[in-house]
Amino acid sequence: MEAVFKSVETRFGDYSFHGEKAPTFRDSWKHEVAAYRFDRLLGLRIVPPTVERKLGGKRGSLQAWAERPLTRFSQGPPPEDPGRAEAFLHAQRFFDYLIFNTDRHVRNVLLGPDWRPVAIDQSIAFHPFLRPYRPLYRFPRGPVEALERLDARALKERLGRYLEKDEIQGLLDRRALLLALVRAARAEGREDAFFDW
């Protein structure tokens, strides 16, 4: 099996994104492992298997190579089920907001033959920002229920080795904001806001 090894560990200062500011941010291999673990906690299963490994004297993330026929939204035939394909994109938005991946672009969204996303490149993520940078109005049921069950203790237990305190707090704050959107959709009776996953 082919895999991608990433050992980047860089810290930058004075980062801003869509009007929010942070004193620092990290581009880190640890985010790759944290994203995989969080993806599995939610039951999304869109991040390829990713583990911590040491290669050539360097510690980093090792991620299974994702072979997918579609690498861009414009490639290949249109999806057989456009509604399902749209739901897949909303699931990716849901995940990207929670981990606050500001590096998601068309070149690192891989799509399977059924248009299911394969999320790669999470090293620039887990910023402490809160403001959604893409509309959040449709939600995957199973992952939402998993998110409702998750608490600070569980997140720290599973992700604490790879995330710093402010990164975990940012994740918890975004969880609260997203679940508030979910509660509002339920209160308004918007059943079309939820899709099976």
What function would you assign to each model-found segment?
Residues 73-77, 104-109, 130-131:
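A short secondary-structure junction signal
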Residues 41, 84-85, 98-100, 146, ...:
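Low-complexity, flexible helical/coil segments
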Residues 76-82, 134-139:
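Short intrinsically disordered coil segments
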Residues 5, 87-125, 171:
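Active-site acidic catalytic loop and adjacent metal/ATP-binding pocket
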Residues 24, 112-197:
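C-terminal catalytic region of ATP-dependent kinase domains
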Residues 26-30, 83-84, 88, 165:
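Soluble non-cytosolic domains of exported or imported proteins
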Residues 72-75, 86-88, 142-146:
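Glycine-rich loops and low-complexity Gly/Arg-rich segments
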